Amino acid sequence: MAGHSHWAKVKHQKGLTDIRKGKLFSKLSREISIAARLGGGDPTFNSRLRRAIANAKDEGVPLENITRAIQKGTGEIAGSHYEDVLYEGYGPGGVAVLIEAATDNRNRTTAEIRNLFSKYGGNLGAAGSVSWIFQKKGRIVLDGDQNDFDRVFEVALEAGAEDVEQKGSEIEVICLPEKLDELQKHLDTAGLTIKSSQITYLPKNSISVTDKETFKSLYRLLDILEDHDDVQNVYANFDAPQELLEQCE
């Protein structure tokens, strides 16, 4: 599918230090809490919670952390009240940046995100300023070593997938957001191994970034945003030459 962001590839290549792993666990737990608060603590009847739990398990989040996050969301134990916030802005080179955040203090997070944009050569925009550049989609990732691509392709398309693509050792399936749960059930029923599934944003088009200094500035901005405690996901609509991407590995 055209318009896939290179940022997803870059951050996947970076790997996890202990500090980053701790932050990832915290962010995954926060998503579980929000999902439980909005849709209840039973994953059988809460698809967002079901996906959040599966993704947390895939990343190695301990079961007790998952249980505690659910209980915080349902109010069974005390915890912060988090809400979803979507931030939009432009980075160096005119690259559109979309940020999903989960915060217990919207004013604090907004001020901090605005400061990061300004500090690293971008600017935070108003609601709707860049979201039109992205499409909301369902995304399922399967293990390419444990699944036959042709089989995944066949089952996914029959179940309504829009796109199936081999990406290194993984197989990526893209669908409409409302088709995600149904598609995942079809893949599960077919005995295919799913690594993760989520609602994501894909850019409709991409901006080519070829200047080294512009790319470095853009990377610094995206990296610092990704590292922010309240930020869950960062999306950007850029393409860059392989030699620039390799500098981030």
Swiss-Prot record:
One of its GO terms (biological process) is regulation of DNA-templated transcription. Keywords: Cytoplasm, DNA-binding, Transcription, Transcription regulation. GO terms for cellular component: cytosol. It is found in: Cytoplasm. Pfam families: TACO1_YebC_N, Transcrip_reg. InterPro entries: Integrase-like_N, TACO1_YebC-like_2nd/3rd_dom, TACO1_YebC_N, Transcrip_reg_TACO1-like, Transcrip_reg_TACO1-like_dom3, YebC-like. The keyword Cytoplasm applies. GO terms for molecular function: DNA binding. The keyword Transcription applies. Gene3D superfamilies: 1.10.10.200, 3.30.70.980. Belongs to the TACO1 family. This is Probable transcriptional regulatory protein Minf_0651. It comes from Methylacidiphilum infernorum (isolate V4) (Methylokorus infernorum (strain V4)).
